[in-house]
Amino acid sequence: MLIPRRVKYRKQHHPKRTGAAKGGTQLAFGDYGIQATEGGYLTNRQIEAARIAMTRYIKRGGKVWINVYPDRPMTKHPAESRMGSGKGTPEWWIANIKPGRVLFELSGVPEDVAREAMRLAIHKLPMKARFISREGGDN
């Protein structure tokens, strides 16, 4: 699982979900990628599920890069607890995703294999995303 080793503050405010991504909107490492077309939160479990779906399909061939990291804690109150009594305990970690952000990159495989691997990974994500490639722009 992707979680920070240590953080300065245990609990943080929820990040803003408005606006487009400022950086990380183009492919940096691989030939193919997944680009978010809408914003939202991505948990460490969702990132791991998408990574596993891709790597199982490409089977030893190719290389996968994860371009997002869940660095913000999300808190939650226990079930059946009364209202108030402060902020809940950190339960999981999230990455704030804005539209246009490249989430995963892939190289070393043919385009049809990459497209299918990315399709499987996109189904694991809670937001809309699209397949992009280095040569032809968006497909």
Swiss-Prot record:
Basic residues bias locations: 1-19
Top-level taxonomy: Bacteria, Bacillati, Actinomycetota, Actinomycetes, Propionibacteriales
GO cellular component: a single term: cytosolic large ribosomal subunit
Domain of life: Bacteria
Molecular function, one GO term: tRNA binding
Physiological role: Binds 23S rRNA and is also seen to make contacts with the A and possibly P site tRNAs.
NCBIfam families registered for this protein in UniProt: rplP_bact
Assembly and interaction partners: Part of the 50S ribosomal subunit.
PROSITE patterns assigned: RIBOSOMAL_L16_1 (PS00586), RIBOSOMAL_L16_2 (PS00701)
Keywords: Ribonucleoprotein, Ribosomal protein, RNA-binding, rRNA-binding, tRNA-binding
One record GO biological process: translation
Gene3D superfamilies xref list: Ribosomal protein L10e/L16
Region named Disordered: 1-23
Organism: Cutibacterium acnes (strain DSM 16379 / KPA171202)
Family: Belongs to the universal ribosomal protein uL16 family.
Protein's name in the database: Large ribosomal subunit protein uL16
